[in-house]
Amino acid sequence: MVVTTSARGGGGDRTPSRRRGCGLAPAGAAALLAGASCLCYGRSLQGEFVHDDVWAIVNNPDVRPGAPLRWGIFTNDFWGKGMAENTSHKSYRPLCVLTFKLNIFLTGMNPFYFHAVNIILHCLVTLVLMYTCDKTVFKNRGLAFVTALLFAVHPIHTEAVAGIVGRADVLACLLFLLAFLSYNRSLDQGCVGGSFPSTVSPFFLLLSLFLGTCAMLVKETGITVFGVCLVYDLFSLSNKQDKSSNGALCPRSPQQPGSPQPSSLPGHPHRENGKQQRFPHKGAWGGCHSPLPPEPKSSGFPVSPRAVWSMMRFLTYSYLLAFNVWLLLAPVTLCYDWQVGSIPLVETIWDMRNLATIFLAVVMALLSLHCLAAFKRLEHKEVLVGLLFLVFPFIPASNLFFRVGFVVAERVLYMPSMGYCILFVHGLSKLCTWLNRCGATTLIVSTVLLLLLFSWKTVKQNEIWLSRESLFRSGVQTLPHNAKVHYNYANFLKDQGRNKEAIYHYRTALKLYPRHASALNNLGTLTRDTAEAKMYYQRALQLHPQHNRALFNLGNLLKSQEKKEEAITLLKDSIKYGPEFADAYSSLASLLAEQERFKEAEEIYQTGIKNCPDSSDLHNNYGVFLVDTGLPEKAVAHYQQAIKLSPSHHVAMVNLGRLYRSLGENSMAEEWYKRALQVAHKAEILSPLGALYYNTGRYEEALQIYQEAAALQPSQRELRLALAQVLAVMGQTKEAEKMTNHIVSEETGCLECYRLLSAIYSKQENHDKALDAIDKALQLKPKDPKVISELFFTKGNQLREQNLLDKAFESYRVAVQLNPDQAQAWMNMGGIQHIKGKYVSARAYYERALQLVPDSKLLKENLAKLDRLEKRLQEVREKDQT
C-alpha cells in the first residue's frame, strides 16, 4: 500500500503531496495489478456457460459453431434477433458479438478461453485506469496504483468479469478509457486563455473518435465518451492560467499539479437479461412488489392514484441510487438477478429508506459545491473527476430519465466504480494528510485489510459463477424473497430431472409473485394429474393470454385427450404469438399428419423452417415426416441440415442411419449409428445398431452391442428380449431361455416373450413346450389381427412338426382368415393337402400363395412337383382305362 502523505502545518487545508516517486517502478506496479486480477478471477477459468451466456453465445444463431460470418451481426441485437423485431432486446453490440465469434473460431466452444479473454481484458482495464489516474487525476503513481488495485479486486466486478456476457462492459470500458486518453493527447495543454483548448494532434483526435465509436459498438453506452470529452473541454475552458509567486500569469505545463484534471466518463452499460422473455415484468419496475394500481372507479380521492404511483416510483428509483452506492461501499450481498421483489417499493415518504436517499443527495450536493469552490482555487480536481466518473456512467441506468430493463444490475457498476475508487483513494490520501503518523498508519493497515477482504469476497463470488447450479442456488440463498431466482433455480432443477425440488421452487415463486405466468406453465409440465396441469395452463393464459408456451402445452394436453380441433386452434395461436417457437410447428404438423392432412402439415413445416431456420429439431422432425410420406431422399437433406446446425444431434444421426438402412445402404447406416455413439453412448443408439448387425448375420457383433445396451438400461424389456433372441440364434438356447423366463416372471403379459420361448423350444425340438408357449400368447388376446395371425401360423408350424396335420391345417386356415396376405400359411396349407393327396385343393392353395409372392422358387418347385404327380396319375388312369 503506497499512500503519499504530507505533514500537517499552518495555513489550513492542504492537498496531498504530488511527488511522482513512490518507490514502485511502473513495470512492477503493472505486474502486481495483473497478478492481483488473475488471482481474484483465475477460479472463473473453470466455469461453464451460465445464465445469459447461454442465450448470448450457445443459443445465438450469429455466434454458435457452424454459423457463417454474415452481415446479420450488424443488423441483429446481442441475442441474435433482428433489431426491427418486436421481441428484440434492442441491445446493439456487434463488435462484442464478433469477439465471441473470434473466440469460437480460434478455440471452439470451450468456455475456458472465453473466461481467459475476460480476465485479460480486466487486467488491461486495470492497467489503463492506473495510467489515466497517474497522468490526468492524481499525477501521483502511488495513488494511481492504489486506485487501480482497489478497482482490480472489487467484488462488484465479478458479474462483469466471471460472466462471459460481461465482456461487453469490460471491453467497452477499455475502449472508453483509451478514447478519452487519445482525446486528452490531442489537446493543447498549454496556456489558451479563455478559449477552448486547441487541437494539436488531429491523428489522436481521429483515433479518439474511432475508439469511441468502437466502444459504442461494443456496448451502446460507450457513446457517452463523446459527452465526457465535451465536459472535459468545458472545464478546460477556464483556469488554464495559474498565478505565479509574483502574481504574473504564465503558461502551465501539463505536468503541473494545478492543471485541470481531465475526467474520464465511462458510458453506462445497459444490462441485458437473456431470460427476460421467459419472465414477464414491466421494465425496471419489474423488480418491485406491487403492480400498477388500477384506475379509480370514482373521483372521491383527494389525491390521484396516478400521482401517488408517480411519487412511489420517484421515491423508489431515488432510493435505488443510494442502494447502488451502498453496493460499491459494502458489497456484502451480491446476486446475479435483483428483479421481482428483491427490493420492495418505497411506498410513502415515511419509509426509513428515504433517509438513505436524502443522505446521498446531501453528500452529493456538498461534494459538488466543494468541487466548484475548489475548482476556482485550482484544488481538489480528484473530487471533480471522481464524481464525473461515478455519476455520468450511471445516469442511463438510474431510471430517472427513461426506463431500462432492470432494477439493480451489478455489471453496470463496472465503469462507475472507477469514480468510486478515485474518490475513495483521494479521501484516504486526505485523511492521511490530516492524521498524525500513528493515525495514518492505522488507516493504511485498515485499507490493506479492506483490500484483502474485497479480494476474498471476489474469489468466493467467482466460485458462485462456476456453474448454473451454483449460480442459481446462490440466488435462492442470497435473496429468498426474490421470485425470479426461485423460478430460475426451478428451471435448472427441472432440466436435471429433480422434479420434486423444482415443483417446490415454482410454488415458492408463485407465493412471492402470484402473477408469474411462466411458473404456472412450467408447474403444469411437471404435474402428472392432467386436470391439475390443465388448470395451471389455463391460469397462466388468464394472466398472459399470449403466452405461447402455455398455449403450446395446453394444445398438446388436449391433443392427448383426443380433442384435436381445440388442440389445433391452440397450437396455431402458439405459433401466432411465438413465430420463432419451433416446437409449436412440429407439434401442429404432427397432429395434422395424424389426421392425414398432409398438405397442411407440409405447409406448417415449410413455414416453421422459414421462421426458424436454425432449429435442428424442426429439420429432424420434418425429415421424419418426409420418410413417413414416402420421400426418403428429400428427408436425407433435412437430417443432414439438423446435424449441421447441431453437430451433437444424435437423434437426427440415428434417424439418418435408419433411413439408410431402409434404403439398403447398410454401410452408411452403420457409419451414422457409430457417429451418434461418439456423441452419446446411449441404449437407444446401440439398439438399432445391434438390429443392423443381427439382420445382416453379424451375430457376434450384435451380441456385443446388445450386451452393452442392456448394461446401460437393465430394466428395459425390449433390449433384454433382443439379447435373448441373439443368444438363441447363436445356439445359446439355455441362456436365452433363462433370460426370457426371467422377463416373463417380471411381466406375465409379455407377448413377445412367449413367441421367443416358442422359437427357443422349437430350436430345442421341444415342440410340446413350444406349443404351450404359443397357447399362452394367444390367451393374452392381442388386438392386432396380424399378430393373432402370426401366432396361429406359428402354432400350425408346431403342430405340423408333431405330424398333427389336420390341426396344423386348421391353424393355418385361421391365420389366413385373419390375414389373407399370409403367403406362407397358404403355401403350408397347400403342402398339407399335397401330402394328403388332395392335389386339386393343394394347387389352389399354391396358386393363391404364388399370387402373393410371384417370385417364390419354392412355390414354383412345389407346383412343378404337383404337375408331375398329376401327370403320372393321369398316365396311370389312362393305362387302367386301356
Swiss-Prot record:
Any one of the GO CC terms: membrane
Biological process (GO), any one: protein O-linked mannosylation
Cell location: Membrane; Endoplasmic reticulum
Keyword GTP-binding: no
Transmembrane segments: 21-41, 111-131, 138-157, 161-181, 198-218, 222-238, 314-334, 355-375, 382-402, 404-424, 439-459
Region (Disordered) residue spans: 1-20, 246-277
The TPR repeat ranges on this chain: 483-516, 517-547, 548-581, 582-615, 616-649, 650-682, 683-716, 751-784, 789-822, 823-856
Catalysed transformations (reactions): a di-trans,poly-cis-dolichyl beta-D-mannosyl phosphate + L-seryl-[protein] = 3-O-(alpha-D-mannosyl)-L-seryl-[protein] + a di-trans,poly-cis-dolichyl phosphate + H(+); a di-trans,poly-cis-dolichyl beta-D-mannosyl phosphate + L-threonyl-[protein] = 3-O-(alpha-D-mannosyl)-L-threonyl-[protein] + a di-trans,poly-cis-dolichyl phosphate + H(+)
Keywords, alphabetical: Endoplasmic reticulum, Glycoprotein, Membrane, Repeat, TPR repeat, Transferase, Transmembrane, Transmembrane helix
Cytoplasmic side: 1-20, 132-137, 182-197, 239-313, 376-381, 425-438
Glycosylation sites: 86
Membrane-protein topology: Multi-pass membrane protein
EC nos: 2.4.1.109
Pathway(s) of this molecule: Protein modification; protein glycosylation
Function: Transfers mannosyl residues to the hydroxyl group of serine or threonine residues. The 4 members of the TMTC family are O-mannosyl-transferases dedicated primarily to the cadherin superfamily, each member seems to have a distinct role in decorating the cadherin domains with O-linked mannose glycans at specific regions. Also acts as O-mannosyl-transferase on other proteins such as PDIA3.
Similarity annotation: Belongs to the TMTC family.
Subunit structure: May interact with FAM168B.
Protein name: Protein O-mannosyl-transferase TMTC1
Biological source species: Homo sapiens (Human)
Encoding gene per record: TMTC1
